[in-house]
């Protein structure tokens, strides 16, 4: 697994670097992402928040290599993964860039497990097929990962036999077994029932404690506050506010837009609490 201790030794150094990133679709009037710049240090958790349609998921997709960029650079440990070219719709990466990209893992909102493979088969496919690692060693590591997320007894199950929360935990194991230096999470609890959200968030908190470098897009503000080291508020494809002190962002944001955004979530939380109280009294 990823060497958390080594990451801590490099704390403060940029693991993932985003510089002046631009993403614009063909025939679009304006960029989806415009002049985005930030660094994610080794062993830190960087959280992206913002309203729907702000470009959060698109940003993660560009970092993961699923969307080409039209400006700026994406780098890992100082080596450029991708340089944007205006008007291009394909990335055209070098062999070295492709190798670096494999060090960035991603967990999606929709699980994306193969329905025709067991839990163990889903986790072991990429490391044996792509990384050419020994099948026996990979299976042993997969079982250890399943134990870590409380699913060792489901290794032979099929995806349709699992709950949404269990499938998402399998997806996290599938990403971890590739030993990513940086792990991206895109609204991984958005498709889950409320009762299943906690089990996934607990796994992510444990990963943060172990020193895994993470970039997280989430609408769970209480969770974001608990896990984030650094945070940005994204809106209309641009950074509205950035804080290297996440707690300060959540308690004392500097921009009016950030204050308004956080107040909305605070209102929603109180409203949900009131609704629950009313139901309990009936």
Describe each region flagged by the PLM.
Residues 30, 81-105, 135, 249-253:
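ABC ATPase NBD coupling module
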Residues 64:
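Helix-to-loop junction immediately C-terminal to a conserved catalytic motif
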Residues 158-162, 166:
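Conserved ABC ATPase signature
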Residues 177-181:
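A short, proline-enriched helix->beta-strand linker immediately N-terminal to the Walker B motif
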Residues 183-186:
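Catalytic Walker B motif of ABC-type/P-loop ATPase nucleotide-binding domains
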Residues 218-219:
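H-loop/switch region of ABC-family ATPase nucleotide-binding domains
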Residues 224-226:
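A short, surface-exposed alpha-helical micro-motif characterized by mixed small hydrophobic
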